[in-house]
From Swiss-Prot:
Oligomer status and interactors: Monomer and homodimer. Part of the essential Sec protein translocation apparatus which comprises SecA, SecYEG and auxiliary proteins SecDF-YajC and YidC.
Key words of the record: ATP-binding, Cell inner membrane, Cell membrane, Cytoplasm, Membrane, Metal-binding, Nucleotide-binding, Protein transport, Translocase, Translocation, Transport, Zinc
Pfam families cross-referenced by the UniProt entry: P-loop_SecA (PF21090), SEC-C (PF02810), SecA_DEAD (PF07517), SecA_PP_bind (PF01043), SecA_SW (PF07516)
Gene, per the UniProt record: secA
Protein name: Protein translocase subunit SecA
Organism the protein comes from: Campylobacter hominis (strain ATCC BAA-381 / DSM 21671 / CCUG 45161 / LMG 19568 / NCTC 13146 / CH001A)
EC id: 7.4.2.8
UniProt similarity note: Belongs to the SecA family.
Residues reported in the UniProt entry to bind ATP: Q88, G106, E107, G108, K109, T110, D509
């Protein structure tokens, strides 16, 4: 209350910031007459000279801002036929300063971005513009590219599905690159899995503008980007667990206020946290159905995990709400956009459980090869900024997580949209009856209406009801998204009725004509409050763009998920006291406030969830930075790895002696020479001279002798190749080892994270425990990298030239022999057909020779089994092969 009163007297912090920017706008406006007089060539020449000064570091970007913004505005007038408004100049400065510009729908965010994009592209380090989908990336790159090209900048676009490294590298090497958050993030992960530096596509992380920043940095922040590979684990457990889950009954949780109260049924649901709790009765039932004595023994730990996921799949996740079945696959529906998330899968076996539930092919479980959260990816940039129509409700999170300030930019024209109070009904049926009646009324008078739904299921239900009423309408959901932009663009036509899930069509303006303005503009009808106030505000923001009239209202029921799960009993009591009859609703600011409080509860839960994920990922992120830095040093190194190999060899030998409890200061009586040589032989294939080792008098002499012998073995091994080849081999092996050991480390970290929450029951902070144990795992990883590099380098064997030539001859003979046999078969086949021209056999396609079994005799005539002869060397490629 006090803050509000002070705000009215002195203005809010946001007001003061905007006023400060407005003073700078006056300086830009003062330059407009000067640049208006210049010809196109003179304008380009002026800009080129500014760019040269920036590159020569004679001028900072901040110093150049006034002239650059004035030039961009003038260039835009000439090539785009659009002039930046003063408020758009303010938005551009907010973005350049690395903050979030909150601008209402229709205020021209795409045009605003051109100002800081051009300014920050002048230093030739690259600017990335992130959009929510490929359509917007392609559209904005094409539309704004005309302006950028006029000023001498190149523009690239990164699209999903096109993974040609050369094309992507060219796009990243452009001055300005457009793409989606997923594509930028995955390219970063893929770059850190490349084996040649020239194959990397990204060139750094300088400046990024994130369009619809709330959607990307808030809504999608709970879902990390993961590159994974198959694990070859059995999938039968998911099918069995699904059968068991279907036989279990959901009950009610115990009353926390009654000590004697017990949970009923086989399991209970916590819908707020999407969790399942199995009761004692449920455990007994599951053990009987699985045929095991103890569901939670170590031997059955996997079974209990399968059952937990099967229960979630069957009782918490709904088809056409959380996912759809498309072309025999379970595809996730993005809960914030209503779009299908093709290629994305639920983790921890939940996706496999859903596949078992729906009876489609169960895909293999995957193992993480590389991962990163959006929070940590976007924090890689030297400067991060964003723009959206709705960010103030999440200002605290933007500040705490990303160090970004949200600044609301005034609209160019006053907002005329009327936002009505919510109408609340007892049941969903009554609500939908009222919704249909309102749509019929609006449709009859020709006022366009955009109907927002929270799920595909609800949008299809509305579709059926409107079809019965013979009202022409369009439906836009994840099942029907091909014409998304067109459907949304036409939603402002007279008499149009459009049903859309959540914020489908974001980034596409709904324009109306004068006739529709006279009818009251676009009517927004929400059929359910979303868990986030932001999503509701986005829906409302589709109407009333650029000073147009409009109206919005939400229709709710006590059976809606938000009110049922999170709503207080206050709303229910009010409705009961009023004694409402069927079909009657309540409209009250008090009730609307109660609904907003329910939304705040959910937002708080989600914020804590994202914060929790980030706190844990921050631990992994520090380790990721170290490994990726080390890997990049290897990848980009033109130097010899000789010194690193020497150092790693010393550490490896120290580790071997440590494992045998041989320490510095020990006498030679404590040296078990046979064990030392046995371990080193098993790990490196090298056979040490026991006599020489026996002569060592102390730890230092023993260690030096082992180092000398291994070094000599290695030098002898590398003798057949020249220095450049050796460097290339060593680099490749080191990179492979880093990737393999990092992959295993991520798996260990996943296991640690899965069970760490249980530490809380022992009054220990899970996060502290996770930090401590993950550090220990990382120390082990570093040691393993050193040891594995030495083991692998010493295990390689180069083929001699004689061996290579012998193999080539044997393979050539084998192929000739097989082809001769094949020709005989073909001729016999022609003769059997009774006088057919045998010359025709020349045109018969070549057939691959029969595959030789690994245990069959090798066709080369050596007398060995195929696997021990040419079957051993055949599949191996390159200069060397591992001695397995």
């Amino acid at each position: 209350m006090i803050q509000k009163a002070l705000g009215k007297i002195f203005g809010t912090k946001n007001d003061r910031i905007v006023k400060a920017y407005a003073k700078r706008v006056a300086k830009i406006n003062a330059l407009e007459p000067t640049y208006e007089k210049l010809s196109d060539d003179e304008l380009k020449d002026k800009f080129s000279k500014l760019k040269e000064q920036v590159l020569a570091q004679k001028l900072t970007l901040d110093d150049a801002l006034y002239d650059v913004f004035a030039i961009v505005r003038e260039a835009s007038k000439r090539v785009l036929k659009m002039r930046h408004f003063d408020v758009q100049l303010i938005g551009g400065m907010v973005l350049h300063d690395g903050n979030i510009a909150e601008m209402k729908t229709g205020e021209g965010k795409t045009l605003v971005a051109t100002l800081p994009v051009v300014l920050n592209a002048m230093n030739k380090k690259g600017v990335h513009v992130v959009t929510v989908n490929d359509y917007l990336a392609k559209r904005d790159a094409a539309d704004m590219g005309v302006l950028y090209n006029f000023l001498g900048f190149s523009v690239g676009v990164i699209l999903g599905g096109n993974y040609d490294d050369k094309a992507r590298k060219e796009a990243y090497n452009c001055d300005i690159t457009y793409g989606t958050n997923n594509e930028f993030g995955f390219d970063y992960l893929r770059d850190n899995m490349k084996f040649r530096k020239e194959d990397k596509v990204q060139r750094g992380h300088n400046f990024v503008i994130v369009d619809e920043v709330d959607s990307i940095l808030i809504d999608e922040a709970r879902t990390p980007l993961i590159i994974s590979g198959p694990t070859n684990r059995t999938l039968d457990g998911y099918i069995k667990a699904n059968e068991v889950a279907k036989q279990m009954k959901c009950g009610e949780p115990a009353d926390p206020l009654d000590k004697n109260s017990k949970a009923t049924g086989d399991f209970t649901l916590d819908e707020k946290n999407r969790a399942v709790m199995i009761t004692e009765a449920g455990i007994s039932k599951a053990e009987k159905l699985f045929g095991v004595d103890n569901l939670y023994s170590l031997d059955n730990a996997v079974l209990s995990h399968y059952l937990d996921q099967a229960l979630k799949a069957n009782y918490l996740f709904e088809k056409d709400v959380h996912y759809v079945v498309k072309d025999g696959q379970v595809v996730i529906v993005d809960e914030f956009t209503g779009r299908l998330s093709e290629g994305r899968r639920f983790s921890e076996g939940l996706h496999q459980a859903l596949e078992a539930k729906e009876g489609v092919k169960i895909q293999e479980e995957s193992q993480t090869l590389a991962d990163i959260t959006f929070q940590n990816y976007f924090r890689l940039y030297d400067k991060l900024s964003g723009m959206t129509g709705t960010a103030q409700t999440e200002a605290t999170e933007f500040s705490q997580i990303y160090k970004l300030e949200v600044i609301s930019i005034p609209t160019n024209l006053p907002v005329k949209r009327i936002d009505q109070n919510d109408l609340i009904y007892k049941t969903e049926k009554e609500k939908f009856d009222a919704v249909i009646a309102q749509i019929k009324y609006l449709h009859a008078k020709g006022q366009p209406v955009l109907v927002g739904t929270a799920s595909i299921e609800k949008s299809e239900k509305l579709h059926e009801l409107l079809t019965k009423e013979k009202i022409n309408h369009s439906v836009l959901n994840a099942k029907n998204h091909e014409k998304e932009a067109q459907i949304i663009a036409n939603a402002g036509d007279k008499g149009a009725v459009t049903i859309a899930t959540n914020m489908a069509g974001r980034g596409v303006d709904i324009k109306i004509n004068d006739e529709v303005r006279a009818l009251g503009g676009l009517y927004i009808l929400g059929t359910e409050r979303h868990e986030s106030r932001r999503i509701d505000n986005q829906l409302r923001g589709r109407s009333g763009r650029q000073g147009d009239p409009g109206e919005s209202r939400f229709y709710l029921s006590l059976e809606d998920n938000l009110l049922r799960i999170f709503g207080s009993d206050k709303i229910k009591h009010i409705m009961e006291r009023l004694g409402l009859k069927e079909g009657e609703s309540i409209e009250s600011r008090l009730v609307t406030k109660a609904v907003e409080n329910a939304q705040k509860k959910v937002e708080s839960l989600h914020f804590e969830s994202r914060k929790y994920i980030l706190e844990y990922d921050d631990v992994a992120n520090e380790q990721r930075k170290v490994i990726y830095r080390y890997r990049n040093e290897l990848l980009e190194a033109d130097f010899d790895l000789h010194d690193k190999i020497i150092s790693n060899r010393e550490d490896y030998i120290a580790n071997v002696l440590d494992r045998l409890e041989i320490f510095d200061g020990d006498s030679k009586e404590n040296f078990d020479i046979q064990k030392i040589t046995s371990i080193i032989k098993s790990e490196t294939t090298e056979i040490l001279d026991e006599n020489k080792l026996s002569k060592a008098e102390d730890y230092k002499e023993l260690k030096e002798e082992i180092i000398k012998e291994l070094r000599d073995f290695y030098e002898e091994k590398m003798a057949p190749v020249d220095n450049e080849q050796r460097k290339s081999i060593e680099k490749m092996l080191y990179l492979q080892i880093v990737d393999r050991d990092w992959r295993e480390h991520l798996y260990q970290m996943d296991i640690l994270k899965t069970g760490i929450g249980l530490r809380g029951y022992n009054h220990r902070d899970p996060l502290t425990e996770y930090k401590k144990e993950s550090y220990n795992l990382f120390v082990e990883l570093v040691m393993r990298l050193k040891s594995d590099s030495i083991r692998t380098l010493h295990s390689i064997r180069f083929k001699t030239q004689e061996e290579i030539e012998a193999e080539r001859r044997a393979i050539a003979e084998l192929q000739a022999k097989l082809q001769e046999e094949e020709q005989k078969k073909l001729k016999m086949s022609g003769a059997d057909k009774g006088g057919e021209d045998l010359e025709e056999t020349k045109n018969v396609p070549y057939r691959a020779p029969k595959k030789i079994g690994r245990n069959e005799p090798c066709p080369c005539g050596s007398g060995k089994k195929y696997k021990d002869c040419h079957g051993k060397s055949g599949p191996k490629k390159g200069l060397f092969a591992n001695n397995d």
